[in-house]
């Protein structure tokens, strides 16, 4: 197993710290490996099948295409491993956002819900905000916000389909 810290650009392209789209895993031996992508406050996803890594040869996999072979946990029937969005008539797969407490669930209500974590971040004050890089910034605009326009709580509610008791589950 090997890990590599990378950046996910707004357009979904994964790059290394220098902005290169080719991600290197050092001295990982040639072989077949599943690739997993994780991002703060998002569900992780992985390839359904191992990819063949050959030393000196780039291996590409586009997680965003609707036909990408992404792992689906057969015991989870409440949601797919990714969320599909349509931009200019083209469908793209995206990571589910909102797993603020990183427990593998996106919950709006109930115990260990992600909504309450946003409220705690702003000090329990409904109209307060907190700026900076944080897991509570679900919409990734640099501000954790519970109420008002561009609040992070609404993203959670949209992801659970507007049904307060719905729970999304990570497929890893």
Which residues fall in each region the model found?
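Cellulosome-associated attachment modules in secreted, modular CAZymes
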Residues: 3-172
């Amino acid at each position: 197993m090997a890990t590599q810290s990378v950046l996910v650009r707004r357009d979904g392209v994964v790059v290394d710290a220098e902005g290169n789209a080719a991600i290197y895993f050092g001295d990982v031996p040639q072989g077949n490996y599943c690739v997993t992508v994780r991002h703060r406050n998002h569900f992780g996803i992985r390839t359904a099948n191992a990819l063949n890594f050959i030393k000196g040869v780039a291996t590409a996999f586009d997680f965003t295409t609707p036909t990408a072979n992404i792992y689906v946990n057969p015991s989870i029937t409440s949601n797919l491993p990714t969320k599909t969005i349509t931009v200019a008539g083209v469908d793209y797969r995206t990571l589910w956002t909102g797993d603020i407490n990183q427990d593998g669930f996106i919950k709006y209500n109930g115990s260990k819900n992600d909504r309450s974590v946003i409220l705690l971040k702003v000090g329990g004050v409904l109209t307060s905000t907190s700026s900076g890089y944080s897991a509570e910034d679900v919409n990734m605009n640099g501000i954790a916000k519970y109420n008002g326009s561009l609040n992070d709580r609404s993203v959670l509610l949209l992801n659970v389909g507007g049904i307060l008791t719905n729970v999304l589950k990570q497929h890893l």
